């Protein structure tokens, strides 16, 4: 038989059950309901429900079938009109539990149906058994195997799975490691894993952290609606309607096996504490991935939850918060104390929304682990049982759990990682670096100013020196201008008077044309011109005298040049006509 997909809804007077049977023979179907029992059969589908309230057959019941969708819709009247049926979306809890048919259970549930007498063990007790003196034995000897799993109900399961579990849990040999030893090893591993550089990097460069903190997961909107509803009405029974399940989630619920859990007071408290621990890890994962699951999601959840990673047992809520805070700052990519507190507030919101919101989170965790190999083992140990158990928990218990979590306060000093000292030292170093950079910038500006002043002084010095050089060059030019006249005047001494018919120009000799013109104007005959290359006796005599005069009057270093010039001019120059 197949269990069909179904959905329940209600109004003040009727309970509506919608059953999807696309491949059923609609010509043959049976419906039975009485009190809290409901049964439906249409080959090959069979559905049996245990309702949270009583229904009655009074002639007002209705039924219809949608052939296009393949859905039977049945409306059944409530025995007490106006009664609210709680937990109609807890599909697994509505499915009738399976009953044992063969052997008597080792632990019986109070109120369960009696076991037939024929299955009772009638074997007689052996009175001749060998007797030994009574000796007090330690608890560890009485329980050689350590317990873990949902409510610490499992033991001896993981002995043959050590190789497969090495990537899932951090504890080695969980079947032989007591709870106290697990905690000691966990604390030591966390302390060794803590990286101050990684923490400080996220502490100072927190742009990505601030973006993550702004993300609003699905429960934020639901929580806001719930608070707005509470302001208008004090009724709390309709909170479950705020959270709905998808078809995929409903399919998950139908696949779970409905069963009862016999938990004593201590085990029940342990289950509630571990639920907080798992929800904290889930809230962190949902926030940092912004609801988009990835290949690291399963690792994040199980790594941040000591319940899943170390099979940790808890005695109070504060220890859960301390452990979660330490692991957030040691293992994941984003390590910031603000993320710890944000996950803490998100968990409170989920618990206050009720078991529908908690169940939705557990179903998501179950799906993540189921798609990850070998993390699916954690579903068998914890999550599947949580998904069934939470559907039967009273809402008041979750509300009390939320209040207990709200009363917890967590500080950085309580994490035992010396975060405040580390931050203070880092801030001090940062201030010193800032002051050092400021000093360097001031000194650099001073150096720049001094260099500019030096360049200005150099420019002024160069201008002064250039002025001096210009004046020196002008004086030298004046001297050079005066020196030719002195040379000429010295040459004109006794040999060439001012009225001489010959002049010495640029080291050469030419005829004084001015005198010739004056002589011509006075009626004096002009001197005849000699042909080029012919030297008269006067020219030769003057040439000899000029050589002697130049050698005596010109300074050293210029004698050879002037002599060569005079020789050249003496040999080639002729008087002008």
Curated annotation (Swiss-Prot):
TM spans (from-to): none
Domain of life: Eukaryota
Main localization (coarse): cytoplasm
Outcome after substituting residue 292 to K: In NEDDS; results in decreased H/ACA small nucleolar ribonucleoproteins production when expressed in a heterologous system
InterPro entries named among the record's database cross-references: CS_dom, HSP20-like_chaperone, Shq1, SHQ1-like_CS, Shq1_C
Keyword Cytoplasm: yes
Effect of residue 335 to C: In NEDDS; uncertain significance
Domain CS residues, every copy: 1-89
Compartments it resides in: Cytoplasm, Cytosol; Nucleus, Nucleoplasm
A GO CC term assigned to this protein in UniProt: cytoplasm
Pfam families assigned: SHQ1, SHQ1-like_CS
UniProt keyword Methyltransferase present: no
Gene Ontology terms: biological process: box H/ACA snoRNP assembly; positive regulation of TORC1 signaling; protein-RNA complex assembly; regulation of androgen receptor signaling pathway; telomerase RNA localization to Cajal body
Binding partners and assembly: Directly interacts with DKC1 alone, but not in the context of the core trimer composed of DKC1, NOP10 and NHP2, nor in the presence of NAF1. Does not interact with NAF1.
UniProt record similarity statement: Belongs to the SHQ1 family.
PANTHER family (alphabetical): PROTEIN SHQ1 HOMOLOG
Protein name: Protein SHQ1 homolog
Source organism (scientific name): Homo sapiens
């Amino acid at each position: 038989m197949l269990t069909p997909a179904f959905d329940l809804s209600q109004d003040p007077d009727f309970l509506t059950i919608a059953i999807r049977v696309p491949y059923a023979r609609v010509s043959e179907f049976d419906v039975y309901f009485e009190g809290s029992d409901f049964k439906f059969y249409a080959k090959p589908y069979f559905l049996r429900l245990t309702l949270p309230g009583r229904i009655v057959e009074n002639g007002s019941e209705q039924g219809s079938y949608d052939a296009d969708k393949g859905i039977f819709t049945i409306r059944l009247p409530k025995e007490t009109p106006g009664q609210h049926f709680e937990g109609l979306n807890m599909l697994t809890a509505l499915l009738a539990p399976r009953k044992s048919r063969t052997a008597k259970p080792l632990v019986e549930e109070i109120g369960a149906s009696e076991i037939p007498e024929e299955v009772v063990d009638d074997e007689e007790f052996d009175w001749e058994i060998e007797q030994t003196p009574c000796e007090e034995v330690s608890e560890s000897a009485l329980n050689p195997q350590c317990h873990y799993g949902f409510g610490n109900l499992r033991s001896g399961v993981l002995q043959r799975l050590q190789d497969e579990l090495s990537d899932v849990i951090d504890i080695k040999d969980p079947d032989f490691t007591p709870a106290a030893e697990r905690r000691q090893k966990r604390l030591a591993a966390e302390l060794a894993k803590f990286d101050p550089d990684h923490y400080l990097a996220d502490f100072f460069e927190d742009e990505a952290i601030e973006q993550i903190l702004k993300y609003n997961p699905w429960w934020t909107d639901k929580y806001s609606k719930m608070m707005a509803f509470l302001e208008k009405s004090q009724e709390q029974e309709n909170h479950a309607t705020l959270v709905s399940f998808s078809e995929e989630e409903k399919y998950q619920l139908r696949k779970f096996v409905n069963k009862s859990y016999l938990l004593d007071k201590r085990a029940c408290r342990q289950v509630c504490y571990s639920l907080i621990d798992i929800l904290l890890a889930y809230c962190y994962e949902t926030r940092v991935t912004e609801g988009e699951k990835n290949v690291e999601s399963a690792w994040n959840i199980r790594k941040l939850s000591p319940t899943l990673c170390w099979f940790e047992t808890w005695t109070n809520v504060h220890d859960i918060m301390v452990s979660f805070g330490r692991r957030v700052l040691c293992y994941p990519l984003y390590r910031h104390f603000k993320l710890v507190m944000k996950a803490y507030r998100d968990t409170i919101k989920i618990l206050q929304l009720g078991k529908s919101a908690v169940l939705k989170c557990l179903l998501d965790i179950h799906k993540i682990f189921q798609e990850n190999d070998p993390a699916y083992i954690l579903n068998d140990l914890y999550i599947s049982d949580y998904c069934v158990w939470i559907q039967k928990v009273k809402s008041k218990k979750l509300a009390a759990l939320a209040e207990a979590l709200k009363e917890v306060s967590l500080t950085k000093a309580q994490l035992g990682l010396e975060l405040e000292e580390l931050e203070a030292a880092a801030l001090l170093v940062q201030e010193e670096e800032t002051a050092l950079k400021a000093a360097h910038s001031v000194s650099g500006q001073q150096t720049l100013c001094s260099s500019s002043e030096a360049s200005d002084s150099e420019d002024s010095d160069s201008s002064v020196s250039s002025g001096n050089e210009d004046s020196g060059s002008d004086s030298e030019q004046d001297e050079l201008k005066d020196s030719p006249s002195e040379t000429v005047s010295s040459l004109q001494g006794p040999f060439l008077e001012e009225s001489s018919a010959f002049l010495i120009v640029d080291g050469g000799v030419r005829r004084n044309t001015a005198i010739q013109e004056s002589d011509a104007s006075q009626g004096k005959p002009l001197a005849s011109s000699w042909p080029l290359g012919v030297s008269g006796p006067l020219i030769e005599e003057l040439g000899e005298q000029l050589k002697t005069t130049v050698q005596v009057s010109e300074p050293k270093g210029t004698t050879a040049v002037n002599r060569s010039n005079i020789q050249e001019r003496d040999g080639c120059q002729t008087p002008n006509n």
